[in-house]
């Protein structure tokens, strides 16, 4: 492995956490749009899998804190998750904001000249599956992009699976 110097680092120094910090509902397209309106070019988002293996944006293993749904994210197919309101918990201005897939976010990021730190946030027991699925989705979405997304995780197992699935994508272990 070669050393990366600051001059080699392709990412901005400032990253908008979960899209726009507390200014919009976290991990939504509204958050990314809000962050971009303040001039941010890079966003950190959390990615996990639905019950049917779709990579989506969500921090928590359960739905209650940031949606009008109940239960575990990985117990629901994405079609059911897509119907949930992920904006009203923040404010009425964001009512009806949905849970986006990683693919949809990738298209927005690339169309808006932005960059992404994808934190792989696996539901316990799905570390390898989540790491591999997120990496493969990222590889496909960014195949022609100049700057790939940064894959990060607190899970060494998820990052190992991401490395095996898409070794060309940069990774970072969070501590």
Regions found by a protein language model. Give the residues of each.
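Phosphate-group recognition and catalysis centered on beta-loop-alpha active-site segments
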Residues: 1-175
